[in-house]
């Protein structure tokens, strides 16, 4: 289900509103009407125009490095430019671009507001918007993930400490900052601050884990981590025979092979009755090749416990989540011992 609405395109990039943004906008407009003041509704809309320009700053520079931009998504807590993986050599410039746009908007509006401003319900619109843009640029320069400053810090540190270690440093700063924000949010009962702290914490954690997995599993293919020559069952095996087979081999899931070809898979969760055969309960297997990379394997394993490695029509191996965790532990240790 799609939870966003497309508005228009700028530089070929779709601009979309998340449904929560629309609900939040309705609340802001409702409160403005109740208070007989449209200032906050107008300010809110103009602020998110500024957020779009901020994200377009990132996107413009990213496109210069050949990065594909899927869309810019507007959320109540800000905007997100959804793009392909940023090349390491362009991360510094791409990270700076957004805050730079915000600072330029803020400074220009601040200068203009000294000579001309729009007063709504006694509030200076341009002056207030200029300060919010300066705050937006400054907040994003905080050297912690998932803010732009975290990416800028990583780009600078990676020249000395390497990409993975620099990511962990920036992520740890981000999580520490988030815990401080959460503490202040709880003490002051500030819901917005609590939500922002959670966003920062989990954003930093996710960035760290993604980079860690990509670094550790770099150049690792399915054939490197699979369990080769797995035991298998046949489709005509009775359920009673299958349960005895499971008890003997101690795995929860098995490939189903017929005439030398993989035709299905079956696990303990597929069995509901003792009657019938394996053919009656088996599922369609999720298949990869020997040269499938870890990123694609993890994507395919999002909704299954195991994938089957097939080459030339023949079953070569099986990769379970246990295999992934085992390989990760070993590769993490190898990475640590390098240091």
Curated annotation (Swiss-Prot):
Record's keyword terms, sorted: CBS domain, Cell membrane, Hydrolase, Membrane, Metal-binding, Metalloprotease, Protease, Repeat, Transmembrane, Transmembrane helix, Zinc
Function, as annotated, reads:
A site-2 regulated intramembrane protease (S2P) that cleaves type-2 transmembrane proteins within their membrane-spanning domains; its endogenous substrate is unknown. Regulated intramembrane proteolysis (RIP) occurs when an extracytoplasmic signal triggers a concerted proteolytic cascade to transmit information and elicit cellular responses.
**Name the UniProt record assigns to this protein:** Zinc metalloprotease MJ0392
Q: Which PROSITE patterns match?
A: CBS, ZINC_PROTEASE
Q: Name one GO cellular component term.
A: plasma membrane
Catalytic residues at 55
Give the record's GO biological process terms.
proteolysis
SUPFAM superfamilies per record: CBS-domain pair
**Documented activity regulation:** Inhibited by 1,10-phenanthroline.
Kindly give the membrane topology term recorded for this protein: Multi-pass membrane protein
Organism of this sequence: Methanocaldococcus jannaschii (strain ATCC 43067 / DSM 2661 / JAL-1 / JCM 10045 / NBRC 100440) (Methanococcus jannaschii)
Q: How the cofactor binds, per note?
A: Binds 1 zinc ion per subunit.
> Which top EC class is given?
hydrolase
Q: Where is the CBS domain?
A: 226-281, 281-335
**InterPro entries associated with the record:** CBS_dom, CBS_dom_sf, Peptidase_M50, UCP006404_Pept_M50_CBS
Q: Which cofactor does it need?
A: Zn(2+)
Q: Give the E.C. number(s).
A: 3.4.24.-
- What is its subcellular localisation? Cell membrane
Family the entry assigns: Belongs to the peptidase M50B family.
Query: Quaternary state and partners of this protein?
Result: Monomer.
């Amino acid at each position: 289900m799609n939870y966003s609405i497309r508005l228009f395109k700028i530089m070929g990039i779709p601009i979309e509103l998340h449904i929560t943004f629309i609900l939040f906008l309705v609340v802001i407009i409702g409160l403005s009407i109740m208070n007989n003041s449209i200032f906050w509704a107008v300010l809110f809309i103009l602020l998110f125009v500024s957020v779009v320009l901020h994200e377009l700053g990132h996107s413009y520079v990213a496109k210069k490095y050949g990065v594909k931009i899927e869309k810019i998504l507007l959320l109540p807590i800000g905007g997100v430019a959804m793009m392909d993986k940023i090349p390491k050599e362009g991360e510094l410039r791409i990270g700076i671009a957004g805050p730079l746009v915000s600072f330029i908007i803020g400074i220009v509006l601040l200068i203009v507001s000294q000579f001309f401003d729009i007063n709504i319900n006694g509030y200076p619109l341009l002056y207030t918007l200029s300060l919010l843009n300066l705050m937006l640029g400054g907040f994003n320069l905080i050297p912690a993930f998932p803010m732009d400053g975290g990416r800028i810090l990583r780009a600078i540190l990676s020249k000395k400490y390497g990409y993975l270690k620099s990511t962990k440093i920036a992520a740890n700063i981000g999580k520490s900052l988030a815990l401080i924000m959460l503490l202040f949010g709880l003490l002051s009962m500030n819901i917005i601050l609590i939500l922002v702290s959670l966003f920062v914490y989990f954003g930093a954690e996710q960035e760290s884990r993604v980079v860690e997995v990509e670094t550790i599993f770099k150049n690792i293919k399915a054939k490197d981590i699979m369990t080769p020559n797995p035991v298998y069952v046949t489709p005509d095996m009775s359920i009673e025979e299958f349960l005895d087979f499971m008890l003997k081999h101690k795995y929860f899931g098995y490939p189903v092979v017929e005439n030398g070809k993989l035709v299905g898979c079956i696990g303990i969760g597929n069995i509901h009755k003792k009657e019938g055969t394996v053919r009656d309960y088996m599922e369609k297997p999720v298949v990869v090749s020997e040269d499938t990379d870890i990123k694609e394997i993890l994507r395919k394993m999002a909704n299954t416990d195991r994938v089957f490695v097939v080459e030339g029509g023949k079953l070569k191996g099986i990769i379970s989540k246990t295999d992934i965790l085992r390989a990760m532990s070993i590769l993490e240790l190898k990475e640590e011992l390098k240091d």
